[in-house]
Regions:
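Boundary at the C-terminal end of the N-terminal hydrophobic targeting segment
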Residues: 16-18
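OB-fold/S1-family single-stranded nucleic acid-binding modules
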Residues: 56-58, 103-123
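Sec-dependent N-terminal signal peptides
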Residues: 3-14
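Sequence contexts marking disulfide-bonded cysteines in secreted/extracellular proteins
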Residues: 20-22, 62-64
Length: 123
C-alpha cells in the first residue's frame, strides 16, 4: 500500500513539473499567439459606464501557475500603455504574439477574466 501511494505521488509530482505553465518568474520567456480585441463592457458587473476593455484571445489553452493552482486559460484581459493605445489599429483583430512582462490573478470587479496582463509587448 505504501508503495502504491508513493508511485501515485511521484506520478502526480512529475506531471506538475512537465506541465509548461507560465509563472511570475518566467512569463517573458513564453510568448503567446492569439488575437487582441476591443470589447466594450460595463465598468462594474452589469452596471456603470461602458468602457473599452482589451482582451487577448489565445490560440490554445495556456497554463498559468498561480497561488491558487495551475489554470488553463483561453483569454486574458490586457492593460495597454499609452503608446500601444495610439497604435491600437495596428495590433487589434489580427494574429499577433504577446510577450507578457507582468501579470496578476484577476476576477475582481475591475478584471473580467481570471488572468490580468498588466504589461506586455505585441508583435
Amino acid at each position: 500500500m505504501k508503495l502504491l501511494f508513493l508511485l501515485f505521488f511521484l506520478s502526480i509530482s512529475s506531471y506538475a513539473h512537465t506541465k509548461d505553465c507560465i509563472n511570475y518568474e518566467d512569463s517573458e520567456s513564453n510568448p503567446i499567439s492569439g488575437e487582441l480585441k476591443v470589447i466594450p463592457t460595463h465598468m462594474f458587473y452589469g452596471h456603470g459606464d461602458i468602457i473599452d476593455n482589451y482582451f487577448f484571445f489565445l490560440d490554445k489553452n495556456t497554463c498559468f501557475s498561480t497561488e491558487y493552482g495551475d489554470w488553463d486559460i483561453k483569454q486574458v484581459q490586457v492593460i495597454l500603455s499609452e503608446e500601444q493605445l495610439k497604435k491600437i489599429d495596428q495590433i487589434t483583430y489580427k494574429k499577433i504574439t504577446m510577450e507578457i512582462e507582468d501579470w496578476m490573478v484577476g476576477e475582481t470587479q475591475s478584471w473580467k477574466t481570471r488572468i490580468g496582463i498588466l504589461k506586455a509587448k505585441f508583435r
